[in-house]
A protein has these predicted regions:
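Structural motif
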Residues: 10, 143, 199-200
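Short beta-strand element of the alpha/beta-hydrolase
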Residues: 9-18, 146
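C-terminal regions of proteins
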Residues: 175-201
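Active-site/substrate-binding loop(s) of hydrolase catalytic cores
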Residues: 20-166, 170-171, 175
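Active-site-proximal beta-strand elements of phosphoester/diester hydrolases
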Residues: 12-14, 98-101, 201
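Phosphate-binding glycine-rich loops and adjacent basic patches that engage nucleotide phosphates
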Residues: 1, 88-95, 182-189
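Short beta-strand-to-loop junctions in surface cap/lid or active-site-entrance loops
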Residues: 1-8
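Functionally engaged cysteine thiol sites
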Residues: 6, 105, 183
Length: 201
C-alpha cells in the first residue's frame, strides 16, 4: 500500500481485486493504471487536494496480481487468484479464489469457476492480508473504502442514496445506477462496511 498524509480520517482506495473483469483480456490493468494516475495526482498535488492533517489516503493499486498477470480468463484464474489455500494453509494451484466473494459477510460457498471462493471465508493469502490491513489502518475519524471495479455503470455503496459516498460519486458519475452493498455475498466492500464500519463502495 502507498500512504499519503497522516490525518485521523482514512480513505482506502483499492483496485483490481479481479485481475480480469468482463470487458477484455486483462482489463484489470486499466484499474491498476487508474490507481497509478491517482498516486501521481496525490504525489504532485496532495496539499492542494487535501487539508494537512485531515486524511490518510492509502492506495492499493493491484489486489490480485497473480490473477492479472498469470491468469487467463474472466471465468476462473484471472478474475480469481491462480491458487487457493488447503486445510493446512498451503498453496494449491488450480481453481483460484474470487477474492471479492471470500470475505466473512453473508459468505456463501460458491463452486462455479467464475466465483469459486472455497469452503470458508478468506481462503486466499491476499484476502487475509487485505482484511488485516483494513483493520489495522482504521482511523479515529471517518473511514472510507473504495473498491474500484469497472464496466457495469453502477455505484454499489453502503449508506444509501443519501449517504456521502454515493452523493460524491453521483456528482461525477450521474449515469451510474445505485445498488446497495447490503446484499453483497462475501464482497470485500460489504465486509468493510457492515463488519468493520467503513463507509464503502
Amino acid at each position: 500500500a502507498y500512504r499519503y498524509g497522516d490525518g485521523s480520517n482514512v480513505l482506502v482506495a483499492a483496485f483490481a481485486i479481479h485481475g480480469w473483469e468482463d470487458n477484455f483480456n486483462r482489463d484489470g490493468q486499466l484499474l491498476v493504471d487508474t490507481a497509478h494516475d491517482l498516486m501521481e495526482a496525490l504525489e504532485q498535488n496532495y496539499d492542494a487536494l487535501i487539508k494537512e492533517g485531515d486524511w490518510s489516503v492509502y492506495v492499493l493499486p493491484c489486489l490480485n496480481p497473480d490473477g492479472l498477470y498469470d491468469g487467463w480468463t474472466c471465468n476462473g484464474p484471472g478474475r480469481c487468484t491462480t491458487y487457493r489455500l488447503n486445510a493446512n494453509g498451503n498453496n494449491v494451484y488450480g481453481p483460484g479464489i474470487d477474492l471479492n466473494r471470500s470475505f466473512p459477510y453473508r459468505y456463501q460457498s460458491r463452486s462455479d469457476d467464475r466465483n469459486y471462493n472455497g469452503s470458508a471465508p478468506l481462503q486466499a493469502r491476499e484476502a487475509q492480508a487485505l482484511a488485516k490491513f483494513v483493520q489495522s489502518v482504521k482511523g479515529s475519524g471517518s473511514n472510507v473504502l473504495i473498491d474500484t471495479h469497472g464496466w457495469y455503470r453502477q455505484t454499489i455503496v453502503s449508506g444509501g442514496e443519501s449517504g456521502p459516498v454515493y452523493r460524491a460519486f453521483n456528482r461525477y458519475f450521474p449515469q451510474n445506477r445505485y445498488t446497495s452493498l447490503a446484499g453483497g455475498s462475501g464482497y470485500f466492500a460489504s465486509w468493510a462496511a457492515y463488519v468493520e464500519d467503513y463507509d464503502a463502495c
